[in-house]
């Protein structure tokens, strides 16, 4: 069943998607996403359709951005997003039948669906934020013979590349660095059948459901936090105050760590960061590892906190959601997507991420 999305849905998508961005987005992101949604609605209806609405051989386009959400200096631009999509259509010669986001919040995909006059599918490459294109590649990082287009647009650069996922993703990351940290991007075309087999099906519906739960929870911080925990089946890792935020921008990523001291125990939980929260540890013991969702909420306001919004002294609740309770694409379980992030962070990820029992 196809649903026409409106302003109330956009608010739910922003609320739910901000939490699912795992520290990549916070309250400062909401006005930007709202502007993308308003631009989308000005261009035409945004229609959410199930994956089964398209035949398996239909071509899809993925809407995303490449870069560092906190440290990058270049800001998201709706016109750049549309241009990236149109450049991809021109380069590939394919007319897409629908659009999906690389990951939530994914409001860029709403814009491209409206601009291209095609549906937004209830699917994503991942139903949570991830730091690299490869992690949203639907398993194609281990298939070097598979080629696709990636297009990026920024104030200082436009790039169109064709090749396998590993090569084109490296070039897109380099373009983002040259543009000050971020480019608006599109990639594809991919067949609907591949997304049906390997995508995070129902990701938009999950995002909207979480957002509606937050919007309906009431204004008190405690009710916001409780609604998030209840909907996601999350578990609290620490409730206290930020004591360290040592995250900085390097080579296209926000990298470093955030430490939160629990007010009840005095123990610190260390959060490893590569654009998003990737690990949580206490006394050297791993508590959660990407693709588990690790999120932060402000105890004073109940708002979701971005990593860049957590200076020392910030009162925060840190919680984790099991990867088994989230809509995930198969790219998350591809060993080829972890080495560069492990190297950047200096910690193991794949051993935990690929263990179904972890």
UniProtKB/Swiss-Prot annotation:
Does the record carry Transit peptide as a key word? no
Name the SUPFAM superfamilies on file.
CV3147-like
Alphabetized UniProt keyword annotations: Hydrolase
EC annotation from Swiss-Prot or TrEMBL: 3.13.-.-
Cystine pairs = none
- For whether the record's keyword set contains Transmembrane helix, the answer is no
Its function, per the record, reads:
Desulfurase involved in the catabolism of S-methyl ergothioneine. Catalyzes the hydrolysis of S-methyl-thiohydantoin-5-propanoate into hydantoin-5-propanoate and methanethiol, the third step in S-methyl ergothioneine degradation.
Give the protein's recorded name. S-methyl thiohydantoin desulfurase
**The organism of origin for this protein:** Variovorax sp. (strain JCM 16519 / RA8)
């Amino acid at each position: 069943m196809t649903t026409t999305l409106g302003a109330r849905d956009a608010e739910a998508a922003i609320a739910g998607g901000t939490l699912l961005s795992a520290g990549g987005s916070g309250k400062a992101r909401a006005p930007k996403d709202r502007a993308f949604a308003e631009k989308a609605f000005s261009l035409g209806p945004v229609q959410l359709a199930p994956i089964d609405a398209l035949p398996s051989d239909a071509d899809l386009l993925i809407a995303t951005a490449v870069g560092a959400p906190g440290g990058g200096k270049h800001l998201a631009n709706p016109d750049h997003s549309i241009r990236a999509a149109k450049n991809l259509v021109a380069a590939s010669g394919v007319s897409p039948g629908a659009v999906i986001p690389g990951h939530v919040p994914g409001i860029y995909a709403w814009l491209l669906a409206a601009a291209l006059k095609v549906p937004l599918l209830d699917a994503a490459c991942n139903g949570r934020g991830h730091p690299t294109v490869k992690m949203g590649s639907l398993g194609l990082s281990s298939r070097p013979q598979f080629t696709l287009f990636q297009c990026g647009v920024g104030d200082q650069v436009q790039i169109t590349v064709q090749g396998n996922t590993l090569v084109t993703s490296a070039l897109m990351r380099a373009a983002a660095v040259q543009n000050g940290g971020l480019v608006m991007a599109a990639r594809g075309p991919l067949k609907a059948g591949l997304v049906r087999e390997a995508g995070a099906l129902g990701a938009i519906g999950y995002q909207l459901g979480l957002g509606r739960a937050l919007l309906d929870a009431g204004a008190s911080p405690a009710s916001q936090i409780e609604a998030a925990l209840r909907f996601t089946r999350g578990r609290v890792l620490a409730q206290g105050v930020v004591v360290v935020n040592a995250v900085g921008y390097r080579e296209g990523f926000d990298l470093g760590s955030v430490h939160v001291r629990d007010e009840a125990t005095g123990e610190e939980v260390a959060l490893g960061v590569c654009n998003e929260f990737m690990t949580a540890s206490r006394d050297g013991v791993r508590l959660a590892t990407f693709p588990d969702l690790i999120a932060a909420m402000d105890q004073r306001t109940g708002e979701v906190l971005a990593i860049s919004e957590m200076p020392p002294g910030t009162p925060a609740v840190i919680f984790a959601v099991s990867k088994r309770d989230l809509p995930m694409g198969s790219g998350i379980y591809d060993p080829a997507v972890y080495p560069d992030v492990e190297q950047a962070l200096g910690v193991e990820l794949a051993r935990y991420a690929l263990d179904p029992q972890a």
